[in-house]
Swiss-Prot record:
Chief localization: cytoplasm
Reaction(s) catalysed by this chain's protein: an N-acyl-L-alpha-aminoacyl-tRNA + H2O = an N-acyl-L-amino acid + a tRNA + H(+)
Native source organism of the sequence: Methanothermobacter thermautotrophicus (strain ATCC 29096 / DSM 1053 / JCM 10044 / NBRC 100330 / Delta H)
Keywords (A to Z) from UniProt: Cytoplasm, Hydrolase
Entries under NCBIfam families matching the protein: arch_pth2, PRK04322.1
GO cellular component: cytosol
InterPro entries listed in its UniProt record: Pep_tRNA_hydro_II_dom_sf, Pept_tRNA_hydro_arch, PTH2
SUPFAM superfamilies: Peptidyl-tRNA hydrolase II
Name assigned to this protein: Peptidyl-tRNA hydrolase
PANTHER family linked to this entry: PEPTIDYL-TRNA HYDROLASE 2, PEPTIDYL-TRNA HYDROLASE 2, MITOCHONDRIAL
The protein's Enzyme Commission number: 3.1.1.29
GO process terms (BP): translation
Locations listed in the record: Cytoplasm
GO molecular function: peptidyl-tRNA hydrolase activity
Length: 112
């Protein structure tokens, strides 16, 4: 079991901004995950992996694949208070779910 957070590298966000957006993605997706998966994930150490994509199009392609696979997810849209315009999609939280299920979609992405 793991959770994957995907960050858009094309936005050139600062480290603090990336951390905040990744946290929003993690919590948002966690809240949409079934209880039995959450318990299993917690028992296995709550593994999280943060990766990046180069564009909004790439992120949305993964988002569609995750939805089609029935994996819990959360698309983060920034509030626009600091570095980027309001409504900008910054991150995607995926899972927690089975490693193999998530890896079929995100396994080729680069670690952040």
């Amino acid at each position: 079991m793991k959770q994957v957070i995907i960050v858009r590298s094309d936005l050139k966000m600062g480290k603090g901004k990336i951390a905040a957006q990744a946290c929003h993605a993690s919590i948002g997706s966690f809240k949409r995950t079934e209880e039995d998966k959450i318990r299993k994930w917690e028992l296995e150490g709550s593994k999280k992996v943060i990766v990046s994509v180069n564009s909004l199009d790439e992120l949305l392609e993964i988002y569609r694949a995750v939805k089609e696979a029935g994996i819990s997810n959360y698309l983060v849209r920034d509030a626009g208070h600091t570095q980027i315009p309001a409504g900008t999609i910054t991150c995607l939280g995926i899972g927690p779910d089975d490693d193999e299920k998530i890896d079929k979609i995100t396994g080729d992405l680069k670690l952040l």
